[in-house]
Amino acid sequence: MNSMDRHIQQTNDRLQCIKQHLQNPANFHNAATELLDWCGDPRAFQRPFEQSLMGCLTVVSRVAAQQGFDLDLGYRLLAVCAANRDKFTPKSAALLSSWCEELGRLLLLRHQKSRQNDPPGKLPMQPPLSSMSSMKPTLSHSDGSFPYDSVPWQQNTNQPPGSLSVVTTVWGVTNTSQSQVLGNPMANANNPMNPGGNPMASGMSTSNPGINSPQFAGQQQQFSTKAGPAQPYIQPNMYGRPGYPGSGGFGASYPGGPSAPAGMGIPPHTRPPADFTQPAAAAAAAAVAAAAATATATATATVAALQETQNKDINQYGPVCSSFQMGPTQAYNSQFMNQPGPRGPASMGGSLNPAGMAAGMTPSGMSGPPMGMNQPRPPGISPFGTHGQRMPQQTYPGPRPQSLPIQSIKRPYPGEPNYGNQQYGPNSQFPTQPGQYPTPNPPRPLTSPNYPGQRMPSQPSTGQYPPPTVNMGQYYKPEQFNGQNNTFSSGSSYSSYSQGSVNRPPRPVPVANYPHSPVPGNPTPPMTPGSSIPPYLSPSQDVKPPFPPDIKPNMSALPPPPANHNDELRLTFPVRDGVVLEPFRLEHNLAVSNHVFHLRPTVHQTLMWRSDLELQFKCYHHEDRQMNTNWPASVQVSVNATPLTIERGDNKTSHKPLHLKHVCQPGRNTIQITVTACCCSHLFVLQLVHRPSVRSVLQGLLKKRLLPAEHCITKIKRNFSSVAASSGNTTLNGEDGVEQTAIKVSLKCPITFRRIQLPARGHDCKHVQCFDLESYLQLNCERGTWRCPVCNKTALLEGLEVDQYMWGILNAIQHSEFEEVTIDPTCSWRPVPIKSDLHIKDDPDGIPSKRFKTMSPSQMIMPNVMEMIAALGPGPSPYPLPPPPGGTSSNDYSSQGNNYQGHGNFDFPHGNPGGTSMNDFMHGPPQLSHPPDMPNNMAALEKPLSHPMQETMPHAGSSDQPHPSIQQGLHVPHPSSQAGPPLHHSGAPPPSQPPRQPPQAAPGNHPHSDLTFNPSSALEGQAGAQGASDMPEPSLDLLPELTNPDELLSYLDPPDLPSNSNDDLLSLFENN
């Protein structure tokens, strides 16, 4: 037996010993503390130790809540391990999630009971600070019987030579001075377990000669023998609480549910699903409660420091950090997040431990709440390492864990080839270890309720996940409801992004499927149609990239992501009276604060069903009248114990607001904000926003803002006359005209320089030149300036017009290479030969001249919008799910009985610029599911789901200047066109202002028209008392009773412009 094997065996023996001590109330604290310290080093989670470690954790999960044991310590221990669940087999990871959730729930209940009696500042269950001695992880125990009682647990410098602690055992004894101990296998710098000779163990106690002692050899027990391979750990519902949108984050956490290799089976002590009813949020809350008060400041500070280090080390230890970055698990983070307790989730101490730090803040380092907060862990994302794995995990040389698919990750990061499909994709690296998860106990497959078709990896692709009906666009996360076929394209790499959330309407957790990360290095095998659910299911739509803001994914490798990986680009408009928590400041020097708001079940359901509605939480500088999102670097946010990742981007203008609906639950919701530095200069606000997708807006504009060819011709003629009068022979385009008698118009979009697909311009623009409408909407999704790329005049969404005449020209020559056409005063046009073909121009038989003679308007066949809309598919709903290019039309929803009809594909006359066909845009059911990840300003019309796009326009735009024309179209939904419940978009919260009624409103076809936000009932309390629970808590209430479109007309405000908060677009129009 070589030294490494011996080391592994000794460590496993020690873990067996700890397992026994954990069953005894008298020794539980010491044993759990030692284990917690040991788990502070990511190497603790290497596969050779997994069975033994899981054996210990099984005991902890079973006894921690019993009398005489330490629930708080047990929870921390599980949380630290859960934070590293990506390093465990899927079965183990799922167990960890469920145990964590269960203990978190119990902790929360206990906290609630004691809350009335305990002063807020006191931590109900704070492990003794001595446990912080985690700085000295090695707790010695005597080798022999390891009687806990006889040997002091606190690091005993005089420990007997034979003493051996797990910490030393596993890590080998490298003490800070790096002195090595003879015979210590781990001390060897080249030791595989000790990467780079990194003295991870520094801080570990001095070496113990006993480390090699064979005496433990016999003690090792294989758990596997105890648990038959057939016993998957998880019980089906274990983690996803169906009722939970976020399901505590565990819900979707389990990707494919393939469970770990059978051999790992640890006895399934997991509690039946029923036990885990409380969402992770509760756990987090508990943790918060438990730890928040005392150590917050300390912890947060520590965490901040850790984070810094972590970010620095990240490259070095990528994976390690990543794990927490990823937001280790929700559970863990959140809890830790919450729990600033000294030990911080991952035993802060441990994290401080040099080794830990070196490790890039091992997850334990995470412990600091803030840390967790950072976690991008996408909101509903699975607790599992959210992609923490993303990092290549070079961290440990040891066997590379097969990381769980991180479902949480919403989008694969190119850089992580390792994880890419390794997960379970049908082709994943661990493809299907056949026996890996035998389906032996089907009943307990890890499938989380969400996963429709859960299939064990072993069945390669067949149906691993239900066949996606529609390919979701890569970015679109089709959250379909109910998992019914998640629409994911089967093969496209995009699908990886698609998050087909399999949402059940009520239950928001969309399981996003990330099939396999389409990482360049890791080619994603196309998923077979059957596996539409990619391995990474991410329960929440909004998941932010899991890594800390500073870590940038290798963008070049990603497909061009929409701003938010979540799916399609969306425009964002405040909804009238939609403020749930009025702008509030944090108390000075208050490290952790809780802000509560309520969602009525009906409101929650509506939010979940409508992809165009979102609860937006953002922070902005108090002097910024535009309320542009700006997050101070020290702010961390978690909702219902689910840490959210804040996307700060490269500069302060690229910060993005958080979208919370997928981590919310019916009833009481708690936003926990952790800061490490004063943020008094900033205000926080929670508001309902309407986030129509760019595609739905396109459809709406197409229906409502199409300028008939005859009007276009009139406008062109008028331009000719005005130009002739004012500028001689300069064309409106600013280019020299052939003469004053002809205008040369480019067929290329001035934004993308590609052929225009849907020509548009601002109502006030005087030029004939158009830009591509979709490209313009995408350009203005985030903090859009809404200025015409041709003349730079303001061209607000509601003032855009689609030029049918130009569209007809584009259609006429769609299959040719021409880049320009000349238009004469009679509006006859002809293509301009490409310069390379000029020689042909002189040739009477030249193709261009021959094939394209001047064409007069009367000869043109104008594109028929209705046909196009019809071609889009059945009842174009404003919420089409954009399928991946190629996606099929999704009628999924229709089958669901939702009001939404499937949207047909929206095919623009010539495919979309990006090559995507409109149908991509249109695609998809009305999707609530669109993950609303758009930047705030995306003004998409998509808003009403149920309504056909036409209505979408109503929201259109935000702007500072009114465009009368809009009235005609956008804002006032034509009857029948209004697509969704119009939310009154109005600027910030002017609850007082009654919504105006739109001139014409469509009679109600709004399936969800009830979305009107009723402040009075909704905001039952003032905005977020920081933690003041005695104050009425605000709640969001969407009035279902309103069905009259007139009443539901949506009002838009320029995105995020408080200045217009009291003016709805109609009023702007009136002023015009």
Curated annotation (Swiss-Prot):
Pro residues bias (residue ranges): 437-446, 517-528, 875-886, 988-1001
Classification via PROSITE patterns: ZF_SP_RING
Region Transactivation domain, annotated ranges: 844-1072
Deletion phenotype: Death between 9.5-10.5 dpc. Mice are approximately half the size of wild-type littermates and display vascular and cell viability defects. Some heterozygotes also do not survive but those that do have no apparent defects.
Zinc finger (SP-RING-type): 734-815
InterPro entries: Zmiz1_N, Znf_MIZ, Znf_RING/FYVE/PHD
Ranges for region Sufficient for transactivation activity: 1-120
Record localization: Nucleus, Nucleoplasm; Cytoplasm
Signal sequence, renumbered to the chain: none
Tissue-level expression: Expressed in brain.
Cross-link (Glycyl lysine isopeptide (Lys-Gly) (interchain with G-Cter in SUMO2)): K91, K841, K850
Record's subunit section: Interacts with AR, but not with ESR1, NR3C1, PGR, THRB nor VDR. Interacts with NOTCH1 and RBPJ. Interacts with SMARCA4. Interacts (via SP-RING-type domain) with SMAD3 and SMAD4 (via MH2 domain).
Function field: Acts as a transcriptional coactivator. Increases ligand-dependent transcriptional activity of AR and promotes AR sumoylation. The stimulation of AR activity is dependent upon sumoylation. Also functions as a transcriptional coactivator in the TGF-beta signaling pathway by increasing the activity of the SMAD3/SMAD4 transcriptional complex. Involved in transcriptional activation of a subset of NOTCH1 target genes including MYC. Involved in thymocyte and T cell development. Involved in the regulation of postmitotic positioning of pyramidal neurons in the developing cerebral cortex.
Domains (record comment): The C-terminal proline-rich domain possesses a significant intrinsic transcriptional activity. This activity is inhibited by the N-terminus in the full-length protein.
Record protein name field: Zinc finger MIZ domain-containing protein 1
Gene this protein is translated from: Zmiz1
